[in-house]
Amino acid sequence: MPYKIIVDLSHSEQVEFPELALSEDDYDVDYIDKNDVLDFDALEDYDILFIGNIQHTKNKKTDKFTPDQLKDIKRFVGEGGGFLLTSGAGGDNNISMKQGSIRVLYKITGVRRFWNGKILEASSNFLVKKKNVLITELFSHSITKGITELVFPNCTFFNLTEEEVEDIISTSEKAGFEYHYNDEVGNVGKVPICVVSKFFRGRSVTVGSSEWLLEDNDFGLDAGDNLKFLDNIIKWLSFEI
């Protein structure tokens, strides 16, 4: 049976699921298009919901989550669904939970804030440019098994809840961060950029970069073990590992 993945495009997401890089026999991918509605009826027949790099604006409502949508996503994951959320440079653009940003999903993801900017790694921890985070040290987890090198371009970092969330990838102690609101760079040190969590009967993975999923990018799926990492994520979210 192929993994059934539903990809949300109704909230101004910038990244689609890289189905062309994967076996058609293993993955069945459908989409909630920008004019469609994300609700439980759209989700219930799938194994995994993917939301990739929402670019929140200050005033538009279409890139925000309504209380009903939050309730339906919680129901989907709580009943055993998998949830993959990826962010990127700019994070949640400082849009508050009250306004309906991706922060509202914190009960599922364990992430309270996606910082508005991008990681700039120190020497030996980036590939070609500082914004391409090179990861060679990973915490032990089913998702990181067999992984020796990952590349996360244009990556943000998270503030986590104190609830059941596990950090499996962090930056180096010397990592910097470029804040988008003033373009200044400051040291942030070791901060989480990939976390996993459990929500009732379901599972969630949150990654601070989305460009590692791109199929036509030198630092995307073909870089390091990025493709195997995605495969491990899908298997873990589907309770295969």
Which ranges hold each PLM region?
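Stable alpha-helical elements in mature extracytoplasmic
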Residues: 14, 18, 69-72, 98-102, ...
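An acidic, glycine-rich "communication" segment
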Residues: 90-183
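Solvent-exposed loop/turn segments at secondary-structure junctions
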Residues: 11-13, 36, 50, 54-58, ...
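Short alpha-beta junction capping motif
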Residues: 44-99, 207
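Short, well-ordered alpha-helix to beta-strand connector turns
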Residues: 26, 45-47, 165
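A short, well-structured beta->alpha microelement
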Residues: 26-42
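A short, Lys/Arg-enriched amphipathic alpha-helix followed by its capping loop at the start of a domain
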Residues: 17-27
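Extracellular ligand-binding/catalytic regions of CAZymes and related secreted enzymes
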Residues: 1-9, 13-15, 181-241
